Amino acid sequence: MDKKNDHKNNLIPQPASSFASSQERPTPMMEQYIEIKAVHHDSLLFYRMGDFYELFFNDAIEAAQALGITLTARGKHLGQDIPMCGVPVHAADDYLQKLIACGYRVAVCEQTEDPAEAKKRGSKSVVRRDVVRLVTPGTITEEKLLDPTRANYLMTLSRIKTSDGEDFALSWIDISTGIFRVTESRQEKLLADIMRVDPQEIIVADAFFHDKSHKSLFNVLDHIVSPQPACLFDTLTAERDICTYFKLSTLEGVADYSRCELSAIVAAIRYIEKTQITHRPPLMQPERQNESATLFIDAATRLSLELIRTTSGQRDGSLLKAIDRTVTGGGSRLLIDRLIAPLTTPSAIDTRLDSIDFFLRNPSLAEAIKLVLKGGPDMPRAVSRLALGRGGPRDMATIQRGFEIIRELNQILNNELLPQEISDVQQIFSNLPVSLHCHLEQALADDLPLLKRDGGFIRSNYHKELDEMRALRDESRRVIAELQAQYAQETDIKTLKIKHNNILGYFIEITSTQASGLTNNPQAKARFIHRQTMANAMRFTTTELADLESRIAHAANHALTLELEIFDTLVQEIIEQVEFIRKAAEALAILDVSVALAYLAEEQGYCRPKIDHSLTFHITAGRHPVVEQALRKQAAEPFVANDCDLSVQENQQYAAIWLLTGPNMGGKSTFLRQNALIAIMAQMGSFVPATSAHIGVVDRLFSRVGASDDLARGRSTFMMEMVETATILNHASHHSLVILDEIGRGTSTFDGLSIAWAAVEYLHEVNHCRAILATHFHEMTALTEKLDRLHNVTMKVKNWDGDVVFLHEVTPGAADRSYGVQVAKLAGLPPAVITRATDVLHQLEQGEMAGKGHKLIDDLPLFSLKATSSLNEEKNKHDALHEALKNIHPDELSPKQALEAIYHLKQLEKNNGL
């Protein structure tokens, strides 16, 4: 994940102790920078200087290039200019976002004392600075840096060697919402578990990262992995450190974590303490994820089915994009959680389906809830920012607005006969902390600043002393105006002004030509004290003005101090209610997802699936959810629905396997994918694109659809296919669903046929799983005579005037041929090539290939003279038509001539057989 410096060594700052003489030593400020940078050598250092974060040396070179900002220089080091660039503090979030996206870590170094305090230690004293946080991809909380629709997970991956091999555990945290989960894993499913969570950053121990036996894993994960010292994962004090963080006396009764799980949990906590430094985000206690409670989907299957993103990394075209009708960030994140981890317990799935059913039967209620939820605030992320000291008044308003929505929704749901899941939601809403809600309503002003340091966020009449200080501060404007009028009259200088800046404070300003009246008159000179001479003006003050300034400054400063004290009190009250806020936010997300899936079902005509523990897989008129919507948007032909029945047949113990044949472009891959997606949608607790669906819970879903090279690891398409097929054959159970497309296509015909043949037999005889297998080997259709649970189905086609029409219908039986030449014709290959291919195919089909290679070469010479002549004839026909079109000038033709030209073109077409 970390970017490596690759510049010359003379751009790397040397510590002050390495210099031979004091003349060579860097300035005190640069000494301080070098000391801090040495501690955070693996991060870009944002070094606060006034209103800017400055970067020096290699950091400046890399940041300037990554951010597209100007690279300049400041001072010298070892006789060379020190590269420097900077970004404004007020715009730092935008620059941080770019750096994090480029894979950098950033150490944010702030001034920890006021410059005035530093001067008390001596005129050359440097303002104290220290790093207050490390910004990494997995630990960001700023609203600008986060995608509201996506969780931002930091994952820790722990490994403990045992006498039997290796134990693995994963923990993952979203510090922006407080989610904290942990699970054990195994080497063969490690990548699948990681891909399911989809973390932004992964923490591993150095030794684990550099272990050659796991090199392939970390090659896949690439830049999101951050190796850390082994001490981060040490379990010696793990229980104590975990208890300290969560303020527990013991972990007994909380969870019986394994040693490997403890290692993953404590590593996450220590890394958060390391990066957040002075603050602790309010995290929920680690929740253990039960492996058997969710549908296992391996990494290759997730990629090929394009659940969250397409293979090119885009959200458009994914299943998520097709089904997401949520209106809140929390709802969108929950929908993703459900989509990446479908359930395997029918009762839990039915609980979710009951909620959707309820809103389908109560559309007016669903509409009312949707209107209230729309654009609802993200309370957990606001709480996290407040707890970490990065929140502002608007984050408090987010909590207040969230409470208002909860109160309104509680009233809407009250007195309704609710399904279990929605009833639980309503119960949570009924526990709204009314006192905190009222406190926030009374305290917060209507128009809030972004930053608390700007003040003005506490409502008038909320705090008596604050109102008094504000009155004095605001009244001063009138007093200053009166004093200005008095001085103007007293000096007879009508243009005299009282102004203010941060250097001089309040001062009297007159033009240089008018200054003699104050500087030459002894009485005026004693009263008006000279402060500054400008090119065209002179500035003065008076004892009276200085006293007034002191009173105003005190009032303004004291007013801000009081506001900040009130802010801190409110933050503490909010943090005390963090458990309710977290549960309420989850309840809001559940409500959003339930209503959204009801809208989806109504809009797309989806049905409620029947889910049980059987081996049934019976889909009536199933459709592909993504392709169907894409066709509708294009106003194209409607999607052709197809049945799929892999259920246990009479007198059979296990479910069926379908062997699918048919032409390319006939819809085989779409049919394969749609059934896998229907299974996922059903088990995530959604209605599905079908007329009816009965699905026995799938424990593992395997999908091998589409070619994928793995060039980075030196694997070809065929090698990848074999690795993925091996995973399927080694791990599929009789409750699994397997989707395989064109197994064995990446090698010779006989090798491929042999592998496909053996794989089908193994799935039938050993795995006993439900499966749909597409193949271009027509010889395999004979297997149905040998394997009683294997059934031939094919994609229906129709011949029309020598052309093939794909009907996209799945029917019983086997394909009579491949229709490859017809597909080539549709793709636009030249007519001569199509004619030649048809001749070659005809001769090949007349006899067996084996033993007749030389005869075929003689019979089928490469584009013979006759063929070449045909090509020339074809070209001449097109040239004649092209010439006729060139000679037509539409603007010069009469209606009769235009009609004659059309007849001429039609005759050319007929004569040339075009």
Swiss-Prot record:
Tell me which domain of life the UniProt entry assigns to the organism this sequence originates from: Bacteria
Q: Name one GO molecular function term.
A: ATP binding
Q: Where does ATP bind?
A: G662, P663, N664, M665, G666, G667, K668, S669
Task: Please give one Pfam family short name.
Answer: MutS_III
The record's annotation in InterPro entries points to: DNA_mismatch_repair_MutS, DNA_mismatch_repair_MutS-lik_N, DNA_mismatch_repair_MutS/MSH, DNA_mismatch_repair_MutS_C, DNA_mismatch_repair_MutS_clamp, DNA_mismatch_repair_MutS_core, DNA_mismatch_repair_MutS_N, DNA_mismatch_repair_MutS_sf
Which GO annotations describe the biological process of this protein? Answer: mismatch repair
Record key words, sorted: ATP-binding, DNA damage, DNA repair, DNA-binding, Nucleotide-binding
A GO cellular component entry from the record: cytosol
SUPFAM superfamilies reported in the protein's UniProt record:
DNA repair protein MutS, domain I, DNA repair protein MutS, domain II, DNA repair protein MutS, domain III, P-loop containing nucleoside triphosphate hydrolases
Q: Region labeled Disordered — which residues?
A: 1-25
**Residue ranges under compositional bias (Polar residues)?**
11-25
SMART domains per record: MUTSac, MUTSd
Under the heading NCBIfam families, the entry gives:
mutS1, PRK05399.1
Question: What is this protein's function per UniProt?
Answer: This protein is involved in the repair of mismatches in DNA. It is possible that it carries out the mismatch recognition step. This protein has a weak ATPase activity.
Q: Which family does the UniProt entry place this protein in?
A: Belongs to the DNA mismatch repair MutS family.
Report the protein name in the record: DNA mismatch repair protein MutS
Q: Which organism is it from?
A: Bartonella tribocorum (strain CIP 105476 / IBS 506)
Name of the coding gene: mutS
